[in-house]
Design a protein with these regions (language model features):
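Bacterial N-terminal signal peptides that target proteins for export
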Residues: 2-12
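Bacterial Sec-dependent N-terminal signal peptides
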Residues: 2-3, 19-47
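Short, intrinsically disordered low-complexity segments
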Residues: 7, 28, 89-90
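First exposed extracellular module after export/assembly in secreted or surface-exposed proteins
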Residues: 34-215
Length: 215
């Protein structure tokens, strides 16, 4: 597997810095990789965060859908990364991280987080992760880590207690107009809110290619 750390920064309000980890596919026989994985490798990643509201503030804790979200007049924030042979993955957008509002001080605010991936031809390739059964083995996962001391050394440990997480996320993916966020979560479209005032943190976004079906 190949992991690429894309975003690392500090923000002002509640702050989120995305550490995006794109995990490439590694079949047992590398020479057959192109034949087996059924999708191209992305060379460009575009993450868009749009502030907005839901039709009802309680919808987030139920099962929100795209239709429940209404974008605000605040311009979307976009972070873009590309990979080249000489540099590997590097940020190409001026924005390094997202400035966000917490939902304690702003209870109606929620954000739409969209992930878009592009191939070497400049074509958006999100559909390749859905077609030919690829939806069964691909999914975004969201994590944050904390520093701990262990045997005199500092290590990073994933936060597993939901009460300690500074964010809350809901999958709202659709396929051919039908909602699949609950039965087949993908994470190309999701709603996220920030639940800890005055925090800045790094959010690890993992695009997983699994060896077996998630069902």
């Amino acid at each position: 597997m190949k992991t690429i750390n894309l975003f690392k920064s500090i923000l002002a309000i509640v702050a989120i810095a995305l550490t995006t980890i794109i995990i490439g596919c590694s079949p047992e026989k590398p020479e057959n990789e192109r034949d087996k994985k059924l999708h191209e490798d992305p060379i460009r990643a575009v993450f868009t965060l749009q502030e907005g509201t839901l039709d009802n503030v309680t919808t987030f804790d139920k099962q929100p859908k795209k239709a429940n979200f209404k974008a605000s007049s605040v311009p979307a924030q976009v972070i873009e990364w590309q990979t080249t042979a000489g540099e590997g993955w590097h940020r190409t957008s001026q924005i390094e991280a997202f400035n966000v509002k917490n939902c304690i001080d702003n209870p109606n605010v929620v954000y739409l987080l969209k992930m878009e991936y592009y191939n070497a031809k400049g074509e958006m390739m999100n559909s390749q992760f859905y077609n030919l059964g690829q939806d069964k083995i691909h999914q975004h996962f969201f994590s944050t880590y904390k520093r701990v001391q262990y045997k005199g050394q500092t290590s990073s440990v994933r936060v597993t207690n939901k009460a300690d997480l500074p964010y809350d996320y809901r999958y709202i993916d659709e396929l051919n107009g039908a909602f699949i966020g609950e039965t087949n979560p993908m994470g190309f479209d999701g709603l996220i809110k920030f639940v800890k005032p005055g925090r800045h943190f790094e959010l690890s976004v993992d695009l997983l290619h699994a060896a077996e079906s998630k069902f």
